[in-house]
Amino acid sequence: DCPSDWSNHEGHCYRVFNEWMNWAD
């Protein structure tokens, strides 16, 4: 599961930092 402030897309969790996105499994 993703942290509550992260989003999920196609099975990957990601979090937006301003204009940057950090992708994580």
Swiss-Prot record:
GO cellular component labels: extracellular region
Domain C-type lectin: 1-25
Assembly and binders: Heterodimer of subunits alpha and beta; disulfide-linked.
Family: Belongs to the snaclec family.
Organism: Bothrops alternatus
Function: Thrombin (F2) inhibitor that inhibits aggregation of rabbit platelets induced by alpha-thrombin.
KW Glycosyltransferase (keyword) present: no
GO molecular function: toxin activity
Name under which the protein is recorded: Snaclec bothroalternin subunit alpha/beta
Keyword Transferase: no
